[in-house]
Structures are given as structure tokens and as C-alpha cells.
Amino acid sequence: MLHRIELPQKIVVGSGAIDALREVLEEFAGRNSSIAVISGPNVWRLYGERFRSIVEGFVEYSFFEARNASVEYAEKLLEDVKAYSPSLVVGFGGGKSIDLAKYVAYRLGVRMISVPTSPSHDGIASPFTSLKGLDKPHSVRTVTPAAIIADIDIIASAPIRLIRAGAGDLIAKLTAIRDWRLAHKLKGEYYGEYAAKLALLSAKHVIEYASQIGRGVKEAVRVLVEGLVSSGVAMCIAGSTRPASGSEHLFAHALDLIAPGKALHGEEVALGTIMMMYLHGGDWRHVRRTIRRLGLPVTAKELGLSDEVIVKALTMAHRIRPERYTILGESGLTWEAAERLARVTGVIG
């Protein structure tokens, strides 16, 4: 099996890392080049002036607003950016801005630089993009960021809920890897030990620093960011989202279909990890305690969802991506089995 691995070429992490932007742009775009900056209005209001002060007089740039992560908007944005003819695209903001930037860069065939301002999920370093309205409710392959600039001062000042959600996305690797191994054993699917161990290492660091991450301690946020980058790199190495996404993500995607916008991605997959760990016969209670220490919801009620929504999502999850084998099997869970699972793990009352 021929396996091509595309990795980020430069990663800058630390306090004041944003100041490395000019150096990174010189390396990947060149002086006096034209770049497109895709960012949300709030991020641009907070950090746009700083961005300008770093790049002004060095490169030409145009700002494009990341309004929503829908396919329809991504296509409109693509046409707007295409008219500007940039040599490089910068995603500056949260997951939405970075996903849109990866999609636009991929369609234009240019490089992309990821500059995250919040750590809500592991898309900051991965070659996969999640857009609403795709025929499949999961990530699709686009482009690997050529460089990642993660300023811990900026990221640690993000809302605590986003920080906790990022940790939830890493906790999910505990069941994602078990699902991947299962698919390898039962279906003969390719399994990459190195990518799997790299993703698991990210989860283990979150467990170790759970209390500090849950409080938003800057040093722990750095550990979280490095874990998110490592998870993205694991996906690059594997050539798929397998090291990062299993049955817990299928559950989260099902939730998004039933109750869109009710919870953050990391919150959903963390809740799913508790239940999927139970199905795997693992220490789900330890997972639940860790998620609680992170300050993440561990019940449907805390997530603002009804018991029925949780059970329905569990029964739907195996159909979200039928080609991806997980602990849910090919037939999935009956309503009774799903309800029992959610009750035993304390997700529903």
C-alpha cells in the first residue's frame, strides 16, 4: 500500500508566537506578495490591528469575513478570494475560520497558514475540514497547513468553554484508537501504530493536566495546544481522521443532525467517549471523572439536551459513516440497548 504523508513544515508555539508571522510569511509567500486573511468579526476586532502592525508594508493583504462554516458560504467566499488572486491564505481565528481557509486554499491550489486564536478542536493542524451542508456530516480532506502559529497568550485568553471543548476533542482519542484497532482486527483496515500512539499521547497529557486545563491555566493550555497539533499531525501521518475520530464522533455527528447548534463539538465527543468506552469494556468511570475535572458536561441535562435526543443519536450513529467500522458494529444499537447504555453511564437520568 502506497502511503503519502504531508506534514506542516513549520510550527511556532509559545507566548508572543504571533510575532513570528512576518518571518513565516516571508518563507512561504515572500515579500510584497498578496495574501488573503480569513477571520471572524470578533477575532478581527480584537487582533486585527496587531495583525496589521506585523504585516503592513511587508505583504499586501485583504480581509475576508468568516461568517459561517456552510458549504454555500464557503463557495461564495471562494469566489471572492479567487478574484483577489492571493499566493497564500491565512486562517486567523477559531475552527470556523481555519476550516474555511483550508477549504479555500485547497480549491485555489495555494498554501495555507493556520493561526488559531482558540483551542476548541484539533482542526488547527489537520488536513481535514468540516463544513455544514456536505453530503456527509463529517470532515473531508482539503490541505495540510504549511505552517501553524499558535500564540499561547492569545489562545489562553479564549473563553474557557472553548478551551475545555478542545480538551474534550482530545479525550475522544481514547475510544477512536480502540475503534481503529477493532476495524483493523475484524475488517483488515490499515492501522498505523505510530499515528495511533501519537494521538493517544495527546489524550494522556490532557488526563494528566485535566484540572489545570479546566481552569484555563496558561501552562496547561500550552500542553492542550501541543496536543491538538500532535493530533492533527497524527491524522496527516495516517492519511485519514482514524486516529482522532471513532464511534464517539459518529455519536456527535448524529447529535448535530438531530439538535444542531446545541453544544460544542468537543463537548459532544467527550460525552460520547464515556459511553463508547463502556461498550469497549474500558474504564469509562475514569474517563467520566476526567471529563468532569475538565469542567465539561457529563450528562444530557448539563449539555442542554433531552434524554430522547441522546438515545436517538446513539441509534443513528452507526449509519453516519457506514464504511467506518467501530464498536457500534454494522447494525448499531437498538433503542433499548442505547437507552440502557446512556443510563448505566449516567448520561441520562
UniProtKB/Swiss-Prot annotation:
Keyword Lipid biosynthesis found: yes
Pathway the protein acts in: Membrane lipid metabolism; glycerophospholipid metabolism
Zinc listed as a keyword: yes
Pfam families: Fe-ADH_2 (PF13685)
InterPro entries for the chain: G1P_dehydrogenase_arc, G1PDH, Glycerol_DH
Gene3D superfamilies assigned: 3.40.50.1970, Dehydroquinate synthase-like - alpha domain (1.20.1090.10)
Record-listed E.C. numbers: 1.1.1.261
One GO location term (cellular component): cytoplasm
CDD domains linked to this entry: Gro1PDH
Example of a GO MF term: metal ion binding
Cofactor binding description: Binds 1 zinc ion per subunit.
Biological processes per GO annotation: glycerophospholipid metabolic process; phospholipid biosynthetic process
Localisation: Cytoplasm
Cofactors named for this entry: Zn(2+)
Catalytic reactions on record: sn-glycerol 1-phosphate + NAD(+) = dihydroxyacetone phosphate + NADH + H(+); sn-glycerol 1-phosphate + NADP(+) = dihydroxyacetone phosphate + NADPH + H(+)
UniProt-annotated binding residues for substrate: D122, D169, H253
HAMAP family reported for this sequence: G1P_dehydrogenase_A
Described purpose of this protein according to its UniProt entry: Catalyzes the NAD(P)H-dependent reduction of dihydroxyacetonephosphate (DHAP or glycerone phosphate) to glycerol 1-phosphate (G1P). The G1P thus generated is used as the glycerophosphate backbone of phospholipids in the cellular membranes of Archaea.
Subunit and interaction comment: Homodimer.
UniProt family annotation: Belongs to the glycerol-1-phosphate dehydrogenase family.
Protein name: Glycerol-1-phosphate dehydrogenase [NAD(P)+]
Naturally occurring in which organism (per UniProt): Hyperthermus butylicus (strain DSM 5456 / JCM 9403 / PLM1-5)
GN (gene name): egsA
